[in-house]
């Protein structure tokens, strides 16, 4: 353990259990700020089958549901950054999420999930959350009147 209340698990989270292929994009050894394609590949490993790269290698990893990890009580925060597999992770952790109602920071992008961002946002809101994005130093509540579609990182906080 690195920190007293932090546990690391060497596995992928989803809505099913077993083994799966983790796709790792292969990139060139050099990385320049104007090489957008190479920058995109950084941190883009995924088990989401709709998000496949032209040049990648796969490794087999264990896949579990968040609900089956037997985590401690009082989970206060969950970070999800899974390149298109967000809804699957949430579906596999519904009991944990509903029981603890943690603050969640979730990266959601249409280019990864291949579905509208608002669909995932609305699914999470139905669990009893308000949805926000960060604009400079302010949390802005997502509604039909603001331009949240340019955002990627969303904060979900239990409704009052």
What are these regions, as identified by a protein language model?
Residues 1-160:
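Phosphate/nucleotide-binding beta-alpha loop and adjacent structural elements of enzyme active sites
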